[in-house]
Amino acid sequence: NREQFGRSLTGFQLIQEKLARMEANTVTGLGLSDRLATLQAAGEFAEVPASVAKMQNARLLRETTALGREICGGNGITVEHKVAKFFGDAEAIYSYEGTHEVNSLIIGRHLTGKGAFV
Protein backbone atom coordinates (compact mmCIF):
# COMPACT_ATOMS: atom_id res chain seq x y z
CA ASN A 1 0.00 0.00 0.00
CA ARG A 2 2.92 2.31 -0.57
CA GLU A 3 2.04 5.73 -1.94
CA GLN A 4 3.95 8.20 -4.07
CA PHE A 5 2.73 11.67 -5.01
CA GLY A 6 -0.50 11.00 -3.11
CA ARG A 7 -1.34 7.91 -5.21
CA SER A 8 -1.01 4.20 -4.65
CA LEU A 9 2.04 2.81 -6.43
CA THR A 10 -0.16 0.22 -8.12
CA GLY A 11 -1.80 3.02 -10.12
CA PHE A 12 1.42 3.87 -11.98
CA GLN A 13 1.95 2.38 -15.43
CA LEU A 14 5.56 1.31 -14.89
CA ILE A 15 4.69 -0.41 -11.62
CA GLN A 16 1.91 -2.34 -13.36
CA GLU A 17 4.35 -3.31 -16.13
CA LYS A 18 6.77 -4.68 -13.52
CA LEU A 19 3.96 -6.54 -11.77
CA ALA A 20 2.88 -8.01 -15.12
CA ARG A 21 6.43 -9.21 -15.81
CA MET A 22 6.62 -10.72 -12.34
CA GLU A 23 3.35 -12.59 -12.95
CA ALA A 24 4.50 -13.80 -16.37
CA ASN A 25 7.77 -15.04 -14.85
CA THR A 26 5.87 -16.88 -12.13
CA VAL A 27 3.45 -18.53 -14.55
CA THR A 28 6.32 -19.52 -16.87
CA GLY A 29 8.34 -21.00 -14.02
CA LEU A 30 5.37 -22.96 -12.73
CA GLY A 31 4.72 -24.29 -16.23
CA LEU A 32 8.31 -25.52 -16.56
CA SER A 33 8.15 -27.13 -13.13
CA ASP A 34 4.84 -28.80 -13.91
CA ARG A 35 6.22 -30.20 -17.17
CA LEU A 36 9.27 -31.57 -15.37
CA ALA A 37 7.08 -33.18 -12.69
CA THR A 38 4.90 -34.73 -15.41
CA LEU A 39 7.97 -36.22 -17.11
CA GLN A 40 9.24 -37.60 -13.82
CA ALA A 41 5.85 -39.12 -12.95
CA ALA A 42 5.81 -40.83 -16.36
CA GLY A 43 9.30 -42.24 -15.75
CA GLU A 44 10.75 -40.02 -18.47
CA PHE A 45 12.91 -37.77 -16.30
CA ALA A 46 15.99 -36.62 -18.20
CA GLU A 47 18.98 -34.37 -17.59
CA VAL A 48 18.24 -31.81 -20.32
CA PRO A 49 14.67 -30.89 -19.31
CA ALA A 50 15.89 -30.65 -15.70
CA SER A 51 18.70 -28.32 -16.76
CA VAL A 52 16.32 -26.20 -18.82
CA ALA A 53 13.94 -25.85 -15.86
CA LYS A 54 16.73 -25.14 -13.36
CA MET A 55 18.47 -22.60 -15.59
CA GLN A 56 15.31 -20.79 -16.62
CA ASN A 57 13.59 -20.84 -13.23
CA ALA A 58 16.69 -19.54 -11.45
CA ARG A 59 16.94 -16.72 -14.01
CA LEU A 60 13.23 -15.92 -13.71
CA LEU A 61 13.44 -15.91 -9.92
CA ARG A 62 16.40 -13.56 -10.04
CA GLU A 63 14.58 -11.18 -12.40
CA THR A 64 11.33 -11.34 -10.44
CA THR A 65 12.94 -10.50 -7.12
CA ALA A 66 14.90 -7.67 -8.75
CA LEU A 67 11.63 -6.23 -10.08
CA GLY A 68 10.09 -6.49 -6.62
CA ARG A 69 13.10 -4.72 -5.16
CA GLU A 70 12.76 -1.94 -7.75
CA ILE A 71 9.08 -1.48 -6.92
CA CYS A 72 9.95 -1.03 -3.25
CA GLY A 73 12.53 1.65 -4.00
CA GLY A 74 14.90 2.31 -1.11
CA ASN A 75 12.86 0.01 1.11
CA GLY A 76 13.81 -2.86 -1.19
CA ILE A 77 17.34 -2.94 0.17
CA THR A 78 16.65 -2.66 3.89
CA VAL A 79 16.54 -5.65 6.22
CA GLU A 80 13.19 -4.51 7.60
CA HIS A 81 11.53 -5.52 4.33
CA LYS A 82 11.48 -9.13 3.16
CA VAL A 83 12.18 -8.29 -0.47
CA ALA A 84 15.88 -7.73 0.34
CA LYS A 85 16.09 -11.23 1.83
CA PHE A 86 14.26 -12.71 -1.15
CA PHE A 87 16.68 -10.93 -3.48
CA GLY A 88 19.66 -12.40 -1.62
CA ASP A 89 18.09 -15.86 -1.65
CA ALA A 90 17.49 -15.59 -5.40
CA GLU A 91 21.15 -14.77 -6.00
CA ALA A 92 22.18 -17.81 -3.97
CA ILE A 93 19.80 -20.09 -5.88
CA TYR A 94 21.04 -18.71 -9.20
CA SER A 95 24.56 -19.71 -8.19
CA TYR A 96 24.08 -23.04 -6.42
CA GLU A 97 21.30 -24.59 -8.51
CA GLY A 98 23.93 -26.16 -10.76
CA THR A 99 24.83 -22.63 -11.85
CA HIS A 100 23.38 -20.97 -14.90
CA GLU A 101 26.55 -21.59 -16.89
CA VAL A 102 26.79 -25.32 -16.14
CA ASN A 103 23.14 -25.89 -17.03
CA SER A 104 23.60 -23.95 -20.27
CA LEU A 105 26.54 -26.23 -21.16
CA ILE A 106 24.40 -29.33 -20.56
CA ILE A 107 21.71 -27.91 -22.86
CA GLY A 108 24.31 -26.80 -25.42
CA ARG A 109 25.84 -30.28 -25.51
CA HIS A 110 22.37 -31.71 -26.18
CA LEU A 111 21.72 -29.20 -28.99
CA THR A 112 25.10 -29.48 -30.71
CA GLY A 113 26.34 -32.93 -29.81
CA LYS A 114 29.56 -31.32 -28.58
CA GLY A 115 30.58 -31.00 -24.96
CA ALA A 116 32.13 -27.65 -24.11
CA PHE A 117 33.05 -28.45 -20.53
CA VAL A 118 36.64 -27.56 -19.72
Question: What do these predicted regions represent?
Answer:
Residues 1-118:
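Alpha-helical interface subdomain recognition
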